[in-house]
Regions:
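Non-catalytic cell-wall polysaccharide-engagement segments
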Residues: 1-44, 163-176
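Zn2+-dependent peptidoglycan hydrolase active-site motif and core
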Residues: 64-68, 83-124, 146-157
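Acidic, glycine-rich catalytic/binding loops that coordinate metals and/or anionic ligands
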Residues: 35-39, 48, 76, 126-135, ...
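Short coil-to-beta-strand transition motifs
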Residues: 38-46, 79-86
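Peptidoglycan-targeting cell-wall enzymes and recognition modules
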Residues: 1-9, 73, 113, 122
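Short, well-structured beta-strand-loop connectors
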Residues: 80-92, 125-140
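Short glycine/threonine/proline-enriched tight-turn/helix- or strand-capping micro-motif at secondary-structure
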Residues: 50-83
Length: 176
């Protein structure tokens, strides 16, 4: 009995702390914390996301499909596309590799991740080339099955993934 009594404390010994904490929480709860994993945006702001990562109705076929990337536009024609991190180009402009991507670039990064940049109107790098973060790698376009000029941007933990589980949401790496 005496042992239990030593651990009994008032439920809220400092109610002012709870009020203060709640006020700060309410003030900042909607603040978007930027994701920082060493990656930068692949196109310049202002960026509009036109199709999110995940299940969607295909704008081409009308069927349900898993969209393995994120579609980005910024309203400017011939928008430059930049490498999101340092790495080595493993695919450059090979429209026949995966015909639904049109002209595209894939970069392997030091952390083992791969980034893909699809539907490019122009590819400015070549296979085997080393690139640095923010280096221009091409121009946004609408090659391959596409409903308009945009960048299909994707993260993968292997090339080329055997299942959807190996694709990652770009928003987990970069704040858009």
């Amino acid at each position: 009995q005496a042992f239990v009594a030593n651990f009994e404390r008032p439920r809220d010994p400092h109610p002012e702390r709870t009020t203060w904490s709640q006020e700060w929480y309410d003030k900042f709860k909607d603040l978007e914390i930027p994701v920082s994993k060493g990656y930068v945006k692949p196109i310049a702001d202002p960026i509009t996301v036109t199709s999110e990562f995940g299940w969607r109705t295909s704008p081409i076929t009308g069927a349900q499909e898993f969209h393995n990337g994120i579609d980005l536009v910024n309203g400017n024609p011939n928008t430059p596309i930049f490498a999101s991190a340092d790495g080595e180009v493993i695919v450059a402009g090979d429209a026949n590799y995966f015909d639904w991507y049109g002209n595209w670039t894939v970069i392997k990064h030091a952390d083992g991740m791969y980034t893909g940049y699809a539907h490019q109107s122009r590819v400015d790098v070549s296979k085997g080339q080393k690139v640095t973060a923010s280096q221009q790698i091409g121009l946004m376009g609408t090659t391959g099955p596409s409903t308009g000029e945009h960048l299909h941007f994707q993260f993968m933990d292997e090339f080329y993934p055997s299942s959807a589980a190996h694709f990652h949401n770009a928003r987990d790496y970069i704040s858009f």
